[in-house]
Amino acid sequence: MDRKENITPNTLEIQKNDEIEGTFCHELFENSFFNEKLCQELLVELPNINKTASSTRIIKWIISNVDTCFTSHHDDNDLYQIKNYSKKIEDKWKEYRQILEKYT
């Protein structure tokens, strides 16, 4: 009897594919909307994800790209704008970033 391995992508792998609708990364990278609820859902899942070289790379990728979104938003020469930007959201991201960094 063949044993099928569970090949369902974990939360981080799904985030890495920013074309998947309904993810934090898709909302921010493709729709220019910082969805705080989706970010919080991602953070809640982190303790359930095995720490591997791959998960570390993906977390670093998420941090880097979200940081780039904020940098681009503040760059007058860049057309990218976070539609729901506020100082409060940026401050929240700084808190969330620290949580993510603990898993790298």
Describe every region a protein language model picked out:
Residues N48-S72:
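Short hydrophobic interaction/assembly module
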Residues S32-Q40, A53-K60, S86:
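Amphipathic, non-membrane alpha-helical segments in soluble helical-bundle scaffolds
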Residues M1-L43:
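Short terminal alpha-helical segments
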Residues L43, P47-N50, E90, R97:
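Residue-level detector of alpha-helical secondary structure
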Residues I63-T104:
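Amphipathic alpha-helical binding modules
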Residues E27, N48, Q98-K102:
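Residue-level signal for well-ordered alpha-helical scaffold segments within enzymatic catalytic domains
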Residues C25-S32, T52, L79-I82, S86:
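Alpha-helical rod/repeat scaffolding segments in eukaryotic adaptors/tethers
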